[in-house]
Amino acid sequence: MQTTLDCIPCIVRQALESARFVSVDPALHEQLLRHILALLARMDMTLPPPFVGQIIHRELHRITGVDDPYWEAKERFNHLAAEMLPWLRQMIDRSSDPLFLAARIAIAGNIIDLGINGALSEAEAGRSMEEALTQPLNGDWELLRSEIPQAKRVLYIADNAGEIFFDRLLIERLPLERVTLAVRGRPILNDATREDARCAGLDAMVAVIDNGSDAPGTILADCSTGFVRTFKAADLILAKGQGNFETLSEESAPIFFLFKAKCPVIAAHAGVEQGALVVLRSKLPGKKG
């Protein structure tokens, strides 16, 4: 998915919010924004927005020396999600369609995206999860449901901290011995890393790998050889979040994208209303097995 002109204001906002996560110094905020605006003037608009996000956060790290400005927010949302897990699991267990409800909850958890809304509160996230209990799924859910039992090698690409606890509810309904969970290789925004997978208890359930990258998405050319090997071997890939949709939507692979369409550009690209919960099969599904 290419960057559009409507992406530019969001990129600038994200850069400023990230700078404010690191420091209260207006001079540093201005320094970073001036540099980012100069980069944006020269950027290749055919690239997905996460390419730019990666550059922004590398520059933020270079200027401030702070490796993980979102660590405190990630801890807060992990704690919130952990508290919600028991009653959500109980709802799933009592449901007439546990797999469907688990998927809906996992996708609703994609609201915990501080790249889209750096001011997201725990209360807002909690309300979103409650609303998901009745919100419909748009797109290709029934197709995904039919493919899960046949899959021999499932790759589940996580998106954000906090959200990864809700991913667990869906992963618990998959054939665990066939599942590999992938997280980011290094901190970027509030994206999930190995530490978040460990906090959610997923390392004790399934194989966990990282992609070796610090991009807020999955840029295969920037990922580790091991991750790319696992990606190519998978016959079913569940890719969570908008960043993974932006970076993988042109890849020929058996991918289902699971995300909340928080951004109007992505909602239009996916053919859904903003705020919708989406399951979308790749237009280039590639070969299985």
Predicted regions and their residues:
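Electropositive, gly/pro-rich neighborhoods at or near active sites that engage anionic ligands
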Residues: 1-151
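Alpha-helix N-cap/loop-to-helix initiation residues
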Residues: 4, 156, 163-164
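Alpha-helix C-terminal capping segments
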Residues: 148, 171-175, 231, 248
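Residues at the starts of beta-strands that form the adenosine-phosphate
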Residues: 152-153, 177-180, 254
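Structural motif
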Residues: 153-155, 235-236
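Histidine-anchored nucleotide/phosphate-binding helix
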Residues: 160-180
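C-terminal functional extensions of proteins
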Residues: 183-189, 193-198, 202-289
